[in-house]
């Protein structure tokens, strides 16, 4: 099914309506959006309907095989550094303003939301580590996220709880050295990955809600 990225509309907003940004000129905006639009129109949009008709496969070795073409499209996005568009260049990101990442995400989600969620969730982890991570954690994780070598997941749903986080039961308790997790998560978005980042809310008793 066809999709055409709204390049001219986006450029107009970025160049005329939003406040100027010292690291962003019209030439950069045009070049970045043009390439992002090509990826959306030529790679992601054609996969959208195909992915709806061809479900991912869970193999006997418990590895997940995504629909044909998804892996290649993700490889193209990762090689281009697109996941880390707004991430600090000190950690192999592009270092562009968040507004550029927002525009690109609009294209990709408009073209193929089921595919684009993977990079969006990874960008969420990039934001989290950038805001609260130690320098050691940033050096360890951010280059991997920015390159697409590691990707993010979303772990909200439990047997008794959907997106109502006040009703979740999974907790983590600190034993003095490590966090011990107890609970169950289901319907994990892009969950078939080895590396998971846990976001918790600490309580006075050192319990945490995952």
Regions found by a protein language model. Give the residues of each.
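Amphipathic, small/basic residue-rich leader segments at the start of a protein or domain
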Residues: 1-116, 140
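Short, well-ordered loop/turn and helix-capping segments at boundaries between secondary-structure elements
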Residues: 19-20, 110, 127-135, 147, ...
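Short acidic, glycine/serine/threonine-rich loops at helix termini
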Residues: 95-100, 127-133, 163-168, 191-194
